[in-house]
Amino acid sequence: MRNKGIFVIAEMAWAHDGSVDKAIDIMKAAQEAGADAIGIHVTDIPTYMVPHYGSGEGRVSAGKEHLKVYQYVLDINLAHDDWIRFAEVARATGIALCVMPNDKVSLEFCEAHISPEFYVLAAAAFVEAEFVKAVAQTRRPTFFRIGGATLGEIESSLNLFRSNGGGEITLLHGFQNYPTKLEDTNIRQMQSLHELFGAPVGLADHIDGGDIVAKTVPLLAWLSAPHALRSTLHGIGLKRARISKRL
């Protein structure tokens, strides 16, 4: 990771809606807009989710609320060959890959076929000791999405990651709602988290944009990564993350 300047991650998540061509279009648009990395979620659905997981408003794209989440996500999940093609185009385009592998099967696939520059661990994965170890053993720089985790869970996962030879760590703090209210961001906690855990800390939430990134600069945060819906692209989890590196 860089030591100065602005590092921008555009997180696509599931905004591709099951189309690798749409995913590539989003990735290219992000690169043209100045993003340094594209964030993707790689998931083996049968490993990751139980079939009876429910649906509802705000959980899937508008108009799809009647569908079960499992079947909906299964239908829009990109195949391994799609991700390989996506990664090849990303490399040719000159944008780094920041991957959240949601399960062990996906992590093994990413290591064998994608070799991303960065990994992301969601807070829900902090209690999966073997998975945290496996990500650590890749030695790749890793973002810890700590929103929703207790201090004890963060400490335990970081200790486990570090004791298994993990790469560079960055914590991403943030209360994630759709959208996150500005008063819920609690950006001053970033400084406390940095002091507690001895790692760079950034902001990762679902605010609508604006000047929140600039407000993190006086806190001497190494990273700030608010997520904002891009008005011209619609889909599940489309976010633009701006990351300010060690100002």
Predicted regions mapped to residue ranges:
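Catalytic cores and adjacent flexible loops of soluble metabolic enzymes
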Residues: 1-247
